[in-house]
């Protein structure tokens, strides 16, 4: 937790989390509990001897693919609707405790379907947790369904068939559509037709881009997939013209500075382009990505960013205001969160004096 003088301010800020993989909130303790409940045999690997050993291994990822190996192994314990509800609700409790007022969460149906767990099971559990969180915790939640880019494109079309058949793009179940997984070998253009089908429903579109691939992947995502948001966007800092375009179009980057360090996409947090984004007027939010695997939930990420960059109250106001304004909740909800933010800014305005 950060020790700066703005610590109380960061705690008080109403937050929106827009880059959060719900499967990435699976803490080792819950992993072991669900494995036992569901009779799932974990790998014969010393790191699976205890929650502490597994967590220690999570602290030594060497790449995105190294992380994904453990990420997909971890989710193998999620079997029933109640498992998904428990997973999500535990995250919502943690998030609400860190003053997250609105969360837009990713989930990966294809990874579960491949294990024999139906899309309907997954989404039912997440929707149940969403409704509980909104009723009991006062946090609003939207679901972003994601395709896995490392799988054959026809499998993504098959998932879209299911989503269209269920009517979930139109009945409020799903608010966004995104794409995740290994990036470099799977350029955005491969999925142009998949995204075009979803675009016809009016659903918000996003994709992971520029995490481990060059800026051209971000540009291609904007041009071919017609996304209104970029998840990560780290590589945008390498292209001044792209930064100008992102700023001019108010394209939000759901930035995850700590996970970029955890996966060795950045040598250290000080190398994150936080200042570059601020100076260019690029809208970005600060997010935790897969906090159970990277060891930092959103409050801790805020604090690490603050300790590294010594941002002003004005800087944080820019970050949070842009994130709220470009969120996918209702206009009424945006106004509520912005009002809360203005009250916090007024209380802590002397910090910039």
UniProtKB/Swiss-Prot annotation:
Cofactors required: Zn(2+)
Broad class of the protein's primary localization: cytoplasm
Gene Ontology molecular function, alphabetical: adenine deaminase activity; zinc ion binding
GO CC annotations on file: cytosol; nucleus
Alphabetized UniProt keyword annotations: Cytoplasm, Hydrolase, Metal-binding, Nucleotide metabolism, Nucleus, Zinc
Enzyme class: hydrolase
Family matches, as InterPro entries: A/AMP_deam_AS, A_deaminase_dom, ADE, Ado/ade_deaminase, Metal_Hydrolase
Cofactor binding: number and manner: Binds 1 zinc ion per subunit.
EC number annotated for this UniProt entry: 3.5.4.2
Active site: 211
Annotated GO biological process: adenine catabolic process; hypoxanthine salvage; nucleotide metabolic process; purine ribonucleoside monophosphate biosynthetic process
Site description Important for catalytic activity, residues in chain: 232
Protein localization: Cytoplasm; Nucleus
Residues engaged in binding substrate: 290
Gene3D superfamilies to which the protein is assigned, alphabetical: Metal-dependent hydrolases (3.20.20.140)
Function: Catalyzes the hydrolytic deamination of adenine to hypoxanthine. Plays an important role in the purine salvage pathway and in nitrogen catabolism.
Family recorded in the similarity comment: Belongs to the metallo-dependent hydrolases superfamily. Adenosine and AMP deaminases family. Adenine deaminase type 2 subfamily.
NCBIfam families registered for this protein in UniProt: aden_deam
Name of protein: Adenine deaminase
